[in-house]
From Swiss-Prot:
Gene3D superfamilies: 3.30.70.240, Elongation factor 4, C-terminal domain, Elongation Factor G (Translational Gtpase), domain 3, P-loop containing nucleotide triphosphate hydrolases, Translation factors. Its main location: membrane. Residues 6-188 form the tr-type G domain. One of its GO terms (cellular component) is plasma membrane. It is a peripheral membrane protein. The gene is lepA. Belongs to the TRAFAC class translation factor GTPase superfamily. Classic translation factor GTPase family. LepA subfamily. It is found in: Cell inner membrane. It catalyses: GTP + H2O = GDP + phosphate + H(+). It comes from the Bacteria. Keywords: Cell inner membrane, Cell membrane, GTP-binding, Hydrolase, Membrane, Nucleotide-binding, Protein biosynthesis. This is Elongation factor 4. The lineage of its organism: Bacteria, Pseudomonadati, Spirochaetota, Spirochaetia, Leptospirales. One of its GO terms (biological process) is positive regulation of translation.
Length: 601
């Protein structure tokens, strides 16, 4: 280990959403004097507007600052800010790989939450030093002693090491930096060995191309070096290398233990994927850093412009967004009802919301989304196996041997009094209870296995409303299970509406179908003829509603006179309606689609 390495500390902050992670990062950077009055703003490391508004971190970020400790030494602090949401767990695991220790924040007024535990396990897997920090001790509801007990019992950490702070007011934040210098070890690594560096994030800049954020484990890299990306074998030359002091700051190079960035004229983020290993072309390392994997989408939906003329703009926008989001996958598709659009794959529901919001906000598009679905496995009688995420590709029932759907292991942490509500919700969502653990007298951890398709359909909203917002949720994939799945079509005037088709569990088909057709009945305007709206599986109608016809008074012009004259006019009208019904197209207004798809989302 070089002398320089002794005084480097690489650490990350992990926490449940809203426990004060970005606020603590702001205070640490103020002490490190990398922010001044001009650059100072809340959530410095959250660079997107959407991150600030929602109060969440989406992209992993970092900052380097110097700290003069009480022992008289100046330490180089590398803070890696990580996303807190379950959708971005892979990004968190790669950022943690670049660290030697973590600050684990627990809100002293809320206690331990589901994602606190999930992120703690990620840190333990990487064998990192874990430093507990109790935040928000300035709040009247804060209970430091109770939080200490939870840190001992629920997390299995030494509460004596826990630092009690208020990130908002800055109270005791300096003690956190002192604890980092004492508790978190200096980075190991051979400064003279062949280069081995981890890409823990990358983003696209319109002027510089792809900016790669790296942590160097062995060796060093400088401007002009030719390097290899190990998973693809592609090589590039370094144009600029440096560290991030909020603004990118070029340096002579990066050595073992250091965290920084490099620019090499790379055009696509997919050429420098998170988790990949960089080594020198002239003296490559033998093995890459373990743990790299491709991000797999879990949730899929159709994305269409409300105004069909905006399709070319949507193509342009989604390709630009892809430059910054390697996990996003998409392919063109068309729908009779909605026109041309895309089938898009996301990491999870939050990722889906963020992609849509960014497309609408940054590219000024009006979009409509079809109901989210997951990837199903269909085993056919012919021996073929198909993976489908789009109801339109669901094969004929007669050809199917079995169907499988993805399940997740979901952990819910809730106050004691809401356990009954959650059990009822999980039962309704076809959940299987695996475990119940009392974390404290009034906090319970429930573990369930449930279908991902049920989790993405209203589960989170219902969980929050059933527990008045107190419950927290975390989930991870747990493989596929055989399930009785069917394709449900919605027929309007006998014609299936492709945008409203969905794959559902046989036991849920009637209930879901009824919800949709009741909504459509209120939204489709009346026509001159009666319109049946039906939910059907195969040839079987599960539910039906009718929109009654508008009645035109054709006998109004007959004043008294012969009854046969009136009958003749009524018969003529009847004939006309019959013909109209056969050839009449029912226009489904855009609002009807939006409203129905909203229920599905």
């Amino acid at each position: 280990m070089s002398d320089k390495q002794q005084f480097i500390r690489n650490f990350s902050i992990i926490a449940h959403i809203d426990h004060g992670k970005s606020t603590l990062a702001d205070r640490l950077l103020e002490i490190g004097q990398v922010t001044n009055d001009r650059t100072k703003k809340d959530q410095i490391l959250d660079s997107m507007d959407i991150e600030r508004e929602r109060g969440i971190t989406i992209k992993a970020n970092n900052a380097t600052f110097d700290y003069l400790a009480d022992d008289g030494n100046t330490y180089t602090m590398n803070l890696l800010d990580t996303p807190g949401h379950v959708d971005f767990t892979y990004e968190v695991s790669r950022s943690l790989k670049a660290c030697e220790g973590v600050l684990l924040i627990v809100d002293a007024s809320q206690g331990v939450e589901a994602q606190t535990l999930a992120n703690l396990y990620l840190a333990m897997e990487q064998d990192l030093e874990i430093l507990p920090v109790m935040n928000k001790i300035d709040l009247p509801a804060a209970d430091v002693e109770k939080t200490k007990i939870q840190i001992e019992e629920s997390l299995g950490l030494d509460s004596e090491k826990a630092v009690a702070i208020s990130a908002k007011t800055g109270l005791n934040v300096k003690a956190v930096l002192e604890a980092i210098t004492k508790e978190i070890p200096a980075p190991k690594g051979d400064p003279k060995g062949p280069l081995k560096a981890l890409i823990y994030d990358s983003y696209f800049d319109p002027y510089m191309g792809v900016v790669i954020k790296i942590r160097v484990f062995d060796g060093s890299i400088k401007k002009g070096d030719r390097f290899l990306i190990m998973s693809t074998g592609k090589d590039f030359t370094v144009n600029e290398v440096g560290i991030n002091r909020i603004a990118l700051t070029p340096t002579d190079g990066l050595g073992a233990g250091e965290v920084g960035y490099l620019i090499a004229g790379i055009k696509k983020v997919s050429d420098a994927k998170t988790g990949d290993t960089i080594t020198l072309f002239s003296n490559p390392t033998k093995e890459s850093i373990p743990g790299y994997k491709e991000a797999k989408p879990m949730v899929f939906s159709g994305l269409y412009p409300i105004n069909g003329e905006q399709f070319d703009e949507l193509v342009d926008a989604i390709e630009k967004l892809k430059l910054n989001d390697a996990a996003l996958i998409f392919e063109k598709e068309s729908s009779v009802a909605l026109g041309f659009g895309f089938r898009v794959g996301y990491l999870g529901l939050l990722h889906m919301e963020i992609v849509q919001e960014r497309l609408e906000r940054e590219f000024n598009l009006d979009l409509i989304t079809t109901a989210p679905s997951v990837k199903y496995i269909i085993r056919k009688k012919s021996g073929e196996v198909e993976e489908i995420d789009n109801p339109s590709r669901f094969p004929e029932p007669i050809t199917i041997e079995s169907t499988e759907e993805p399940y997740v292991k979901a952990t819910v942490i809730t106050p004691n009094e809401y356990v009954g509500n959650i059990m009822a919700l999980a039962m309704d969502k076809r959940g299987i209870q695996l475990d119940t653990v009392y974390l404290t007298q009034d906090k319970v951890q429930l573990t369930y296995e449930l279908p991902l398709a049920e989790l993405i359909f209203e589960f989170y909203d219902k969980l929050k409303s059933f527990t008045r917002g107190y419950a927290s949720l975390d989930y991870e994939p747990s493989g596929y299970r055989i399930s009785q799945l069917v394709k449900m079509d919605i027929l309007v005037n006998g014609e299936p509406v492709d945008a409203l088709s969905m794959i559902v569990h046989r036991t849920k088909a009637e209930q879901r179908g009824r919800e949709i057709i009741e909504k459509l009945k209120d939204l489709i305007p009346r026509h001159q003829f009666m319109i049946p709206i039906q939910a059907a599986v195969g040839g079987k109608i599960l539910a039906r509603e009718s929109i009654s016809a508008l009645r035109k008074n054709v006998t109004a012009k007959c004043y008294g006179g012969d009854i046969t004259r009136k009958k003749k006019l009524l018969e003529k009208q009847k004939e006309g309606k019959k013909r109209m019904k056969q050839i009449g197209n029912v226009e489904i207004p855009q609002e009807a689609f939006l409203a129905v798809l909203k229920t599905n989302n």
